[in-house]
Amino acid sequence: GVASGPVSFMKIFDAATEQIKQGGRRRGANMGILDATHPDILEFVDAKRDPETLRNFNLSVATDETFWTAYRSGNPFDLLNPRTDEVVATVDPDDLLDHIAEMAWETGDPGMLFLDRINEDNPTPSLGRIEATNPCGEVPLLPYEACVLGSINLGHHTDGDEIDWDALRETVHLSVRFLDNTVTMSTFPIPAIETQVQRTRKIGLGVMGFHDLLVDLAIPYTADAAIDVADELMAFIREESVAASRGLAAERGPFPAFEDSTVEVPIRNAVTTSIAPTGTISMIADCSASIEPIYNVAYTKRVLGGLEMVNDRFIDIAKDRGFYSEALLETVHGRTSIQDVDAVPDDVKRLFLTAHDVPPERHLRIQAAFQQHVDNAVSKTVNLPRSADVGAVRDIFLRARELDLKGVTVFRSGARPEQVLGEDPLKEECISECEYVGPEPG
């Protein structure tokens, strides 16, 4: 017989996930990753053209320098039998990239992963090559590894109009200890997962509330100063997380695979940092998600039953400055930009740029500023308006490669009817049962 290929088996996993919902309501999430060299790559790229297919999957195409060399040179790109490495077909890499961009434009999937960049930071190559990530792409994983994540609310780490570095240092050290304890105390569904997790003790400490922090510092998200803050901030968190993990190694011992790793100084956790999307926990913490710009000032979060969200910082500034009114709140509700709202002063508008006000280049440069100090990866979405064309998506993939990112996701507004944050919730009728299950690798 002939195997039916990866896409057919993904549909089986998707159906199983649909039946096993979290608490009977919230869907689980899967990440489907296929190497660009796979003979079924075109079928994979097209897999979510039907919006009812693979609703519990994010998709990403895995590439490395082999693909990008072929793309730059214009040479044919080989598709290989994954068992024998035999060339079974060739494609035009330019056409393949166009097709990936077209489907990402249409559906939000697939994203793009850069596996060579990911494996540059693999601390345990003796245990294998990393070929996959967790569902949102912020944790590259070896087979049977799991992600243990935590995120610091940056909005709680300011002193006036400055970052409170002492408070942040204390939070980082406590968080690393907490996450390491979590690795120890967690139970896993099968022994192989427990063995692999305990072997490397990987953790992913990240941030949320970055846009809130910028508002407190009076820095627009698109300003060069925002990139500087991202750079300095994540360098500090990285340095302190490593110091905390080394302290734990002295106290508890290094991770068991340390001797066979590329890490030179004993450390408790093979990796310590990661930027997760924080879609749910940022709601609980009442802060902006991850390192993303805000999506709206006031909007409906498209979860089961709907949830009204209002930016407290915007309300506080409006009241302090004397331009708050219920009519203003109604005006800004559900808008993807407040830049044309006359009642809002220009300097305030600049602080509350939304995801659609931020040009793709600025999305990517913020991601790059964080990524250079993150040993896992960064989950970030480059948002585009409905009017964006396929070429804009393609350009983002190319620029992400230039900026040395580990992955990138593009989402054009309206590409999926169940997106969590609707442009105009009053006009949207499709209510999702859970958060948007879309690709967010970074």
Task: Indicate where each model-derived feature is located.
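Glycine- and acidic
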Residues: 1-3, 21, 25-31, 79-86, ...
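Secondary-structure capping and boundary motifs in well-ordered enzyme cores
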Residues: 1-9, 33-37, 59, 92, ...
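Active-site cavity-forming subdomains of large catalytic enzyme subunits
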Residues: 1-154, 158-159, 165, 192, ...
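Structured alpha-helical segments in the cores of large, soluble enzyme domains
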Residues: 6-23, 61-71, 103, 138, ...
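Internal maturation/activation junctions in enzymes
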Residues: 25, 84, 171-194, 198, ...
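Short, glycine-/Ser/Thr-/acidic-enriched flexible segments
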Residues: 39-41, 49-50, 84-85, 110, ...
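Catalytic alpha/beta core of large soluble enzyme barrels
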Residues: 138-140, 179-184, 273-430, 435-442
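Long, charged, mostly alpha-helical binding arms that flank functional sites
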Residues: 144-208, 215, 327, 338-351, ...
